[in-house]
Swiss-Prot record:
Quaternary structure and interacting proteins, as annotated: Part of the 50S ribosomal subunit.
Any GO BP annotation: translation
Cellular component annotations (GO), alphabetically ordered: cytosolic large ribosomal subunit
InterPro entries on file: Ribosomal_uL15, Ribosomal_uL15/eL18, Ribosomal_uL15/eL18_sf, Ribosomal_uL15_bac-type, Ribosomal_uL15_CS
Pfam families: Ribosomal_L27A (PF00828)
Source organism of the structure: Thermodesulfovibrio yellowstonii (strain ATCC 51303 / DSM 11347 / YP87)
Protein name: Large ribosomal subunit protein uL15
Domain of life (superkingdom): Bacteria
Keyword tags: Ribonucleoprotein, Ribosomal protein, RNA-binding, rRNA-binding
Length: 148
C-alpha cells in the first residue's frame, strides 16, 4: 500500500449540494425552495425572535433598573511608588506634570492617586481624587494634597 492508494472511508465524504446551477444538476430551476411564497424569496427568513405575530418575549418582559454607564468617571490611576520617580524633579505634582513626564499616558476623566508604596519626601499634590491610604501617607511625611 502506498500513500496515493489511501482513500476516505466509503460514505464519510458527502458531496456538496450545488443549487441553482441548471436543470441537469437536479437542483436547478427552483433551487430546492419550492414554488412561490415568502420562503422562496431572497431575504425570506423570518427575523430572529419572531414568534408568528405574537408579542415577542423580548417585548413582553418589562424593563428594569437603569444604567449609569455613560456618566461613569474613569480616572488615570497612579500609585505613590510611581510618584517617587519624579519626586526629586518637581515640587508640585499635577496631572499635567505626570503627563509630561510620561508616568500617565492618558488622563481620561482626571487623575486618582492610590496608596500602593511609600513616599520619600514631603510634596504638594494636585489631583482629582485620592484614596484614604494615599492621603494619610502623604500627610504623614508633611506633604499637602489639593483636590481640583
Amino acid at each position: 500500500m502506498k500513500i496515493n492508494d489511501l482513500k476516505p472511508a466509503p460514505g464519510s465524504k458527502k458531496k456538496a449540494k450545488r443549487i441553482g446551477r441548471g436543470l441537469g444538476s437536479g437542483h436547478g430551476r427552483y433551487a430546492t425552495k419550492g414554488l412561490k411564497g415568502q420562503k422562496s424569496r431572497s431575504g425570506g427568513a423570518k427575523g430572529a425572535g419572531f414568534e408568528g405575530g405574537q408579542m415577542p418575549l423580548q417585548r413582553r418582559v418589562p424593563k428594569r433598573g437603569f444604567s449609569n454607564a455613560p456618566f461613569k468617571k474613569e480616572y488615570a490611576i497612579v500609585n505613590l511608588e510611581d510618584l517617587n520617580k519624579i519626586i526629586d524633579e518637581v515640587d508640585i505634582i499635577t496631572p499635567e506634570t505626570l503627563l509630561q513626564k510620561g508616568i500617565v499616558k492618558d488622563l481620561k476623566d482626571g487623575l486618582k492617586i492610590l496608596g500602593n508604596g511609600e513616599i520619600k519626601k514631603s510634596i504638594t499634590v494636585k489631583t482629582n481624587a485620592i484614596s484614604k491610604s494615599a492621603l494619610q501617607k502623604i500627610q504623614s511625611v508633611g506633604g499637602k494634597v489639593e483636590v481640583i
